[in-house]
Amino acid sequence: MRWIENVERFVFGSECLGCGKGSERLDPWLCPDCVRELEREAEECRCPTADAYSLFPMRPLTRRLIHALKYREIPGMASYLVKHSRVVGGMLGAELSLLPKPFYFVPVPLHRARFRERGYNQAEKIASALALATGGRVCRWLKRKSFVVSQTKLSKGERERNVADAFVSALPGELPTRGTVIVTDDVYTTGATTGACLNAFGRDFPLMLKVCTLVYDEPASAVADYVADCRMDWEYNSEL
């Protein structure tokens, strides 16, 4: 309806978040060309390890959308990316169909200081979108017990030490007897954060454990992505 489109233009603006060009055909964040590009990138979904799935590779477009999710107060970007992924159909859907059901999506917890700063936990938004798409549930079975510095500029070993023992399990008194626990986060780089989350469940945890993130970023390119993120953040703040 026309009035809905007008509200979307007022709230989100008329510039594509992908290419920055003005467009009257946003849906509501990307122009038709960038939507097609996003769906092409979804065909390149990654499996960084045997136990981890990522819906998209890190590309300039997906980096901008992740930046919008985390820093531009657009939590709806999580469901938007899941919607345009292959989490139901395609290779990833086929992989998930082999796992025991139901799915219990456990978001990587955000420290209270970060939550106050951002207003929401992007991992929870991702978990909710994945649960809706697959018929799963969101379960807050992890707690963060320490605040860690940004992982982006650290090596794999430094990342692992940075998040070691940062999480503890917060399991219900009675666990389900079947299904798959899927730890969710926005970006998979070296697996240090999600690995620390998996370790928090302990060796004798009775359910299958997996990881699912929105994007996979090659460790070698993570610093360049950090620089690009900082540049986009500066450009955005300078407009305010």
Residue map of PLM features:
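Glycine-rich phosphate/pyrophosphate-handling loop used in enzymes and phosphotransfer proteins
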Residues: 1-240
